[in-house]
C-alpha cells in the first residue's frame, strides 16, 4: 500500500507517485532500494504537487535511478542514532557510520526535524563560558548557549582554534562536542579526524559530514543531523555541549541549489526565498534550556568579502559573539591570531561579566587602538618622534599584544611547549597589571607564548640569566 513509483528525475530532485490514501507527509523519508544495482537511496519529501505526486530531495547520488522504480514510504522523517555510542565516530547525513568501523546501534533515535525548545523551557540567564583562551575570555567572551561566528581566511588557524576549544571544554568542563562538516573539503575533514585522534579528544566528540562532493540535499540536512545529536546530550544527559558547524555559508548555498531545483522563484542575489526561515529553524534550536546548553561555534565564509551578502548577513542576525582571525597577526607569530579590536561579544557588559573584567577589557582595547593609530607615525618618522606618553602606550601595547598569545595543548606536538589553560581570574589579573604598568621593566619577549603573568615573570628571569 505504501509503495509508490518514480515518475520524474531532475538531478537531485525526484518525483514519486503514490496511491491517494498513502501519500507521505512533508519531511517523510522515502526509500529506493535496488540491491542488484547497488542503489540504496533515501529521499525527503519537500512538496506535494497534486495528482498524488510528491517532489523529493535526494540525500545521496541519483545515479542509476529510472522511472518506474519502486519507492517505499517509511512513514517517518529521517532519524539518526543519538547517545553515548555516537562519541568517537563519524556519520553521514542519515546517521550511518562512515569511518569503516562497525555499525552503530543505539537504543534511541531522533528525527532530524524537531521543534525548538519552548520559551518556558529556555534558560533566560546569561552565563559566561570560560574557554581558557586569554584573548577570547577577556575581549570577546562566549556565553553558554550562545552562537559564535568564526571568521578567517585559509591558513590563519580556524581549525587549530576549534580543536583547542574542543580540548579545553572536554578537559576542564568534562563537556562533549559535536562537529558538523557542512559542504567543506573532504581532505580537511580527514585531517581533522586524524588530528583529533592524535590529540586524544576524539572520545569526547561525534562528527557528522556532508562534504562538497555530495548532493545539495545532504549538505542542507547534515547540520540538522549534528544538531540532533547535540540535543540529546543537552536534554537527556544535561550536558553543556559545543556544536561546531563548518561552514554555515555552505548550508545556505545548498538551500539555494535545492530551492532552484524545486522550482521556487529566487530572491535577492539568487538566494532562496526561504533563506531566513531555514536559517532560523536551525539557529533557534541552538540554545540554553534548564537542563543544559548547546553553544555553537560557526565558521562563516564571506563571499567576495561582502558582509552585506544575504547569506552572511542572515547568519549575523543570530550571533552573540564574533571571533575574527587576522592574517597580519599570525604573520607576527602571535597565535591564536584573534584580532582584539575586530572581535566582539554581546556579553561584554559590566552587568554580565562584572565591573573589573569590563574595565580591564576596555583599557586593553583602548591601548591597542592608540597603538594602531600611532603605527603610521612610527613607520614614517620612527619611535623617537613620539612623546613620552605615546612611547609608554606603544611599549605597553606591544606587551599586551604578545601576552594575548598562548601555547595550545593541541599544538604541543608541533611547538614542543606544553599547552596552557588560563582561568579567567588569572587573565584579568595579568592584563590589569600590564595596563597599570607593573611590568614595564620586563622585556617584551617574556610575554610571548606564556599562560599566566607569573610565567612571564619567570621567563623574564630566564632571559635575563
Curated annotation (Swiss-Prot):
It is a peripheral membrane protein. GO terms for cellular component: plasma membrane; proton-transporting ATP synthase complex. It comes from the Bacteria. It comes from Desulfitobacterium hafniense (strain Y51). Its EC number is 7.1.2.2. It catalyses: ATP + H2O + 4 H(+)(in) = ADP + phosphate + 5 H(+)(out). The gene is atpD. Keywords: ATP synthesis, ATP-binding, Cell membrane, CF(1), Hydrogen ion transport, Ion transport, Membrane, Nucleotide-binding, Translocase, Transport. ATP binds at residues 152-159. The keyword Cytoplasm does not apply. HAMAP family: ATP_synth_beta_bact. This is ATP synthase subunit beta. Gene3D superfamilies: 2.40.10.170, Bovine Mitochondrial F1-atpase, Atp Synthase Beta Chain, Chain D, domain 3, P-loop containing nucleotide triphosphate hydrolases. Produces ATP from ADP in the presence of a proton gradient across the membrane. The catalytic sites are hosted primarily by the beta subunits. It is found in: Cell membrane. Its main location: membrane. F-type ATPases have 2 components, CF(1) - the catalytic core - and CF(0) - the membrane proton channel. CF(1) has five subunits: alpha(3), beta(3), gamma(1), delta(1), epsilon(1). CF(0) has three main subunits: a(1), b(2) and c(9-12). The alpha and beta chains form an alternating ring which encloses part of the gamma chain. CF(1) is attached to CF(0) by a central stalk formed by the gamma and epsilon chains, while a peripheral stalk is formed by the delta and b chains. CDD domains: ATP-synt_F1_beta_C, ATP-synt_F1_beta_N, F1-ATPase_beta_CD. GO terms for molecular function: ATP binding; ATP hydrolysis activity; proton-transporting ATP synthase activity, rotational mechanism.
